[in-house]
Amino acid sequence: MLRDLGHSVEVTTVARDFDPAEEAAKVVAADAIIMQFAGWWMGQPWQVKRWEDLVFTRPEIASGDGRSRTDRTAIYGTGGRNTQKTYMLSSTWNAPLEAFNEPMQFFEAKGIDGLLFPMHKTFQFIGMRPLPSFIANDVLKNPTIEADLERFKAYLIRCFG
């Protein structure tokens, strides 16, 4: 889909072996990163976190936390080197949408971005700006795969078209 829109695409499957230096080079070269994952115990699977830990700690991605011993006004979390880049979190969940958005439901109306707040902060730490998150819900107990794929295609066109 993105290639059809004229974009170059690199894909990494974090459950397989990868070279952190090569992955960091991909991040440096990218205009945007899309993280696609299945929600797992209220967050991303451990393989995604492992990828973040091994790739985002490389010096070409972040140059510290942004603070300085000589400038007491420097703000924590501003040391990222990727300030011209964006990221997208795209996730699938077995929970229905109302579980995320309604106050009396499990996630207490926090929404997907509230649940994925730590991931958003990780990307902010390395300097990236968010695109709107995408979520496919109820994927096991009430799947609407074709409709979800159509929504995702329209979403990609909105963000990257």
Regions found by a protein language model. Give the residues of each.
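Structural motif
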Residues: 17-25, 141-148
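A short beta-strand-loop structural module common to alpha/beta enzyme folds
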Residues: 5-20, 134-137
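Glycine-rich phosphate/pyrophosphate-binding loop and the adjoining helix
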Residues: 106-161
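A short, Lys/Arg-enriched amphipathic alpha-helix followed by its capping loop at the start of a domain
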Residues: 1-7, 122
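Hydrophobic/aromatic beta-strand patches that form the interior of the parallel beta-sheet core
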Residues: 10-12, 34, 88-90, 131-134
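Helix-loop-strand module that forms the ligand-binding subsite of alpha/beta enzymes
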Residues: 22-119
